[in-house]
């Protein structure tokens, strides 16, 4: 079997691809835990297919992998505790994105800005997802810190919009 060679190997491309594989793998593991038998069976198959790529990425970037693993377990703990603080709930996602973003550069000055950009992008992503899923989470009884705080959907959406705008402003600041 002939293995194709990379036309243009770039270390940042390798890093971002590895970061994506590591993130997706851990998200799949989380989905398996949170899902019913049929859905988890499908994701177990996906995890099995992804495992060789995950092992390769983990060997290249062990600190990134252990950081993502740690923050994913923190996210699970926060959800299991039914944490009502939006700031605490979005912190693990923000830290994961910060960790990934700062790994793009070796320059300490760049790392500082990339870390902040990644952090606020993660915060933005978590709050936007919580806002988008609000009605579905209420219907299915899933964890959603917006609903735990507000009970009124419109009030929760308004709060989310304000926080999303703040995060977008911070992203622009770090950009």
What label would you give each PLM region?
Residues 3-116, 123, 127-165, 173-175:
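Acidic catalytic motifs of isoprenoid enzymes
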């Amino acid at each position: 079997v002939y293995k194709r060679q990379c036309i243009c190997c770039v270390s940042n491309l390798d890093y971002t691809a590895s970061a994506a594989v590591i993130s997706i793998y851990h998200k799949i593991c989380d989905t398996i835990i949170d899902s019913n038998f049929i859905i988890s069976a499908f994701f177990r198959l996906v995890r099995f297919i992804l495992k060789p790529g995950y092992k390769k990425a983990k060997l290249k970037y062990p600190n990134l992998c252990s950081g993502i693993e740690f923050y994913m377990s923190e996210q699970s703990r926060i959800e299991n505790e039914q944490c009502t603080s939006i700031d605490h709930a979005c912190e693990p996602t923000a830290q994961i994105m910060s960790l990934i973003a700062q790994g793009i550069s070796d320059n300490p000055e760049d790392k500082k800005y990339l870390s902040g950009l990644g952090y606020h992008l993660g915060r933005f992503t978590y709050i936007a997802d919580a806002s988008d899923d609000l009605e579905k989470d209420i219907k299915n009884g899933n964890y959603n810190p917006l609903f735990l705080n507000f009970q009124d959907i419109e009030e929760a959406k308004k709060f989310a919009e304000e926080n999303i705008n703040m995060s977008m402003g911070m992203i622009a600041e770090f950009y």
